[in-house]
Structure formats: structure tokens, C-alpha cells
């Protein structure tokens, strides 16, 4: 069991220990979050944070890098094996920096890029106007259809019209299988590069719970802390040697300076764990749990975007289902110790800070041992709360139920 920490800085100590209590007592349903292993916590909190070393293994601008070179090479080789790729850069601090580096390796400022819109489940870095991707590039978007699915014929039509240099596939709130082969065909037809952002589904991909883009994408990017259950950060991959050189240059010195070796160590330990048979068992359960979770909401009368899920997440339209916004739903559920995030839905009429939906994910609580029955129970608790948004007495009863559940499923340390 992870113990409370003691620091001379009592204000930070209290905040960390309060967060420990929150993580233990709340049902964590944010799809982009997970609970790392004790080994990964140790690696990230190690003395590697003291070491600086711009450059790449055996090509550093600083001395004393022989040990961090070992760590970085381990992370690289393990990622190659997991994703079946030839080249990997494990240095990106975050998914946003990784996407910036990946796009820059494929396009020049002012070139056209094409990605899924934010409301349809895309990410800020896929061309949203307030992001670098919408500021430095001529960004265009495609949408899901009225049923919440990608329509590849429509995507091809848009691609022919806007003639993108880069097409981005892979999303932050899309609950269905992505057909990377079809995206490759679209990219080839319009002469575009294909960038696959698999940040949400990477863990599913390496365990054969989702098709891999390694055969089709020119460049692949993933964060390492979602379904991969590794340290926070990102990696960029390719099978093209020339693109690999460009990627390396854009990561360093393009967008970053010295690597975070403690974070790279955490990535390496997470990749080691992902290579074990138990990780396959875990990801299988993540998908089973998500399917049952979605089905239970539908049985209880909720409107689930696309009618279900094929992966680790689902989107519930709370505006049409319960007459409340995603923001209010997030607040209600937070008060009964269920943590979710408000999320836009396709064709949303509410703003991104209000939204009509909530996004739910199963990876974190599956790590804590939840199986199908627990997710069915949590769905029922959530629906009771959302149907009665102002019944504070009921909310207290439901919170007590949640606390009894979380007591049985401790954090993984």
C-alpha cells in the first residue's frame, strides 16, 4: 500500500496526501488516466532526475551519460518490439510536443493538414485553431456521421478538396475501431502523409485488441500513460529512416532541450510490463469492461454515442439523456466520488467548457481489479445520480455505496 509522504514543505505534502486519498476513494473513469505500477513510480522518482544530457545515446553534448544511455536504449528497443517498428524516439515530454514534432517532420508552416474535429472526437493538436496545429498550418477537419462513425468516403471527398500534406487519424474520444488501411488508401490517393495518433489505444494495439497502424502510417505517435499504463510522456515511431532523422531533429533541438531521463526510465519499465503476458490479460479485460459498461447505460435508457464501443472508452450524451450539461454531470458525479470529464459530442451545441456529454474510460479501474459486475454497478449508481441531479440525500447514499466499493479495490502499490 502506498503510504503518505512526509516533506519539509508541508503545503505540498498535504496536497499530495490529499490526492492519494482522492485516488483511493474515487472511482476513476477518466479515459486518459491510469494507475502506474510501483516499479514505474520508483523509476520516475529516481536520481535520474539529476542528470542532464542533450542529444541521443552515444551522441550527447554532456559527459557522464553512459547510464542514461542504457536506460534510453532499453526504452527504444522495447518500444520497437511492442509496436513492430524500426525507429523510435522516446524523448518527447508530452503528446502535444510529440505531435508538434511529428507534424513538423512531415509538413512546412502553412501546409494543409486534415484531422478529425474536436466535437467529433479529435484532439486539440490535430488542427484546432487555438493550438499550434491550427496556428502554423492550414488546418481542415472531417467529422463523424450522424451515427457517430467515421465515414471514409466522406473523408476521401474532403481530402480531395483540400489536398492535405498530412492526414491525421487516431483520436481522444472515438469509441470505434479505426481502419488504418482505409486511411492509407485515402492518403495515397491525394498524395498525403499519414500520421496515426494512437495515444488512447496504444495498449490495445500492442495486445491485438485493436488493429495496428505500423504497416500503414508514415509516422505513429502515442502518449505512454493512458492504456499503456507507463510514465507520463510520449514517443514517436516510424519505419522510414529519412523520416526518423527528421523526427529526431524536430524533437531535439527543434522543440526540446535535455531529455527527462527519470521519465524515460518510467517509460522503459512500463514497456517491460507491457511485454509480459499479464498485460494482454489486462487489456482484454479493459475492452470487456467497456463493452459491458456501455451496454448497461443503454439498457438504462442513456444515449451512448455510436451505440456502444469497440475500445476502452464510451461517450454518454447526458444532455439528451438527462437534460443536464456535461459540466453539471461531471460536478454531480464528482460529489459522489466518481471522477469523469465533460466532453463534447458530435454536432454539440454547447461550448467545450460546458458540453453535452461525458467521456468514460475503463483502464484505471480495471487496473484496480474491476470486472464486468463492478462496471454494471457503477453505471447504475451514475444513472441514479444523473436522473436526480438535485437530490442531495440520494447523492450522499450513492457516495457511501461508492466508498464501500473502492475499499475493496485498493491502489496497485
Curated annotation (Swiss-Prot):
Location(s) in or outside the cell: Cytoplasm
Gene Ontology BP annotations: glycine biosynthetic process from serine; tetrahydrofolate interconversion
Sequence positions bearing N6-(pyridoxal phosphate)lysine: 226
Alphabetic keyword roster: Amino-acid biosynthesis, Cytoplasm, One-carbon metabolism, Pyridoxal phosphate, Transferase
One GO CC term, this protein: cytosol
Reaction catalyzed: (6R)-5,10-methylene-5,6,7,8-tetrahydrofolate + glycine + H2O = (6S)-5,6,7,8-tetrahydrofolate + L-serine
E.C. number(s) listed in UniProt: 2.1.2.1
Domain of life: Bacteria
Listed pathway(s): One-carbon metabolism; tetrahydrofolate interconversion; Amino-acid biosynthesis; glycine biosynthesis; glycine from L-serine: step 1/1
Site (Plays an important role in substrate specificity): 225
Single GO MF annotation: glycine hydroxymethyltransferase activity
InterPro entries to which the protein is assigned, alphabetical: PyrdxlP-dep_Trfase (IPR015424), PyrdxlP-dep_Trfase_major (IPR015421), PyrdxlP-dep_Trfase_small (IPR015422), Ser_HO-MeTrfase (IPR001085), Ser_HO-MeTrfase-like (IPR049943), Ser_HO-MeTrfase_PLP_BS (IPR019798), SHMT-like_dom (IPR039429)
Residues binding (6S)-5,6,7,8-tetrahydrofolate, per UniProt: 118, 122-124, 242
Any matching Pfam family: SHMT
PROSITE patterns hit by this protein: SHMT
Names of the cofactor(s): pyridoxal 5'-phosphate
UniProt-listed Gene3D superfamilies: Aspartate Aminotransferase, domain 1, Type I PLP-dependent aspartate aminotransferase-like (Major domain)
Enzyme class label: transferase
Alphabetized NCBIfam families for the sequence: PRK00011.1 (NF000586)
Assembly notes: Homodimer.
Protein function: Catalyzes the reversible interconversion of serine and glycine with tetrahydrofolate (THF) serving as the one-carbon carrier. This reaction serves as the major source of one-carbon groups required for the biosynthesis of purines, thymidylate, methionine, and other important biomolecules. Also exhibits THF-independent aldolase activity toward beta-hydroxyamino acids, producing glycine and aldehydes, via a retro-aldol mechanism.
Family: Belongs to the SHMT family.
Protein name: Serine hydroxymethyltransferase
Amino acid at each position: 500500500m502506498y503510504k503518505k509522504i512526509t516533506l519539509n514543505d508541508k503545503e505540498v505534502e498535504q496536497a499530495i496526501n490529499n490526492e492519494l486519498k482522492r485516488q483511493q476513494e474515487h472511482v476513476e473513469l477518466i479515459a486518459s488516466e491510469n494507475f502506474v505500477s510501483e516499479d514505474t513510480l520508483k523509476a520516475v522518482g529516481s536520481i535520474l532526475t539529476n542528470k542532464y544530457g542533450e542529444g541521443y545515446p552515444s551522441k550527447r553534448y554532456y559527459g557522464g551519460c553512459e547510464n542514461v544511455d542504457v536506460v534510453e536504449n532499453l526504452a527504444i528497443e522495447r518500444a520497437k518490439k511492442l509496436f513492430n517498428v524500426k525507429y523510435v524516439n522516446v524523448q518527447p515530454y508530452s503528446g502535444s510536443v510529440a505531435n508538434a514534432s511529428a507534424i513538423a517532420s512531415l509538413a512546412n508552416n502553412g501546409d494543409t493538414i486534415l484531422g478529425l474535429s474536436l466535437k467529433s472526437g479529435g484532439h486539440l493538436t490535430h488542427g484546432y485553431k487555438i493550438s499550434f496545429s491550427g496556428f502554423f498550418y492550414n488546418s481542415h477537419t472531417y467529422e463523424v456521421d450522424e451515427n457517430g462513425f467515421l465515414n471514409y468516403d466522406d473523408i476521401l471527398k474532403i481530402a480531395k478538396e483540400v489536398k492535405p500534406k498530412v492526414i491525421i487519424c487516431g483520436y481522444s474520444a472515438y469509441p470505434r475501431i479505426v481502419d488504418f488501411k482505409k486511411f492509407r488508401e485515402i492518403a495515397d490517393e491525394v498524395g498525403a502523409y499519414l500520421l496515426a495518433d494512437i495515444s488512447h489505444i496504444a495498449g490495445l494495439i500492442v495486445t491485438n485488441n485493436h488493429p495496428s497502424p505500423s504497416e500503414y502510417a508514415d509516422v505513429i505517435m502515442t502518449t505512454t500513460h493512458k492504456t499503456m499504463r507507463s510514465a507520463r510522456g510520449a514517443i514517436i515511431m516510424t519505419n522510414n529512416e529519412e523520416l526518423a532523422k527528421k523526427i529526431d531533429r524536430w524533437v531535439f533541438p527543434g522543440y526540446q532541450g535535455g531529455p527527462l531521463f527519470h521519465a524515460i526510465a518510467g517509460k522503459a519499465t512500463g514497456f517491460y510490463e507491457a511485454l509480459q503476458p499479464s498485460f494482454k490479460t489486462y487489456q482484454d479485460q479493459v475492452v470487456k469492461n467497456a463493452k459491458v459498461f456501455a451496454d448497461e447505460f443503454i439498457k438504462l435508457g442513456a444515449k451512448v454515442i455510436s451505440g456502444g464501443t469497440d475500445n476502452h472508452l464510451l461517450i454518454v450524451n447526458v444532455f439528451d439523456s438527462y437534460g443536464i450539461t456535461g459540466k453539471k454531470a461531471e460536478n454531480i458525479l464528482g460529489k459522489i466520488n466518481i471522477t469523469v470529464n465533460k466532453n463534447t459530442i458530435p454536432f454539440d451545441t454547447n461550448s467545450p467548457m460546458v458540453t453535452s456529454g461525458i467521456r468514460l474510460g475503463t483502464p484505471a479501474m480495471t487496473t484496480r481489479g474491476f470486472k464486468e459486475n463492478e462496471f454494471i454497478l457503477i453505471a447504475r449508481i451514475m444513472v441514479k445520480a444523473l436522473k436526480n441531479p438535485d437530490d442531495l440525500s440520494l447523492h450522499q447514499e450513492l457516495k457511501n455505496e461508492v466508498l464501500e466499493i473502492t475499499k475493496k479495490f485498493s491502489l496497485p502499490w
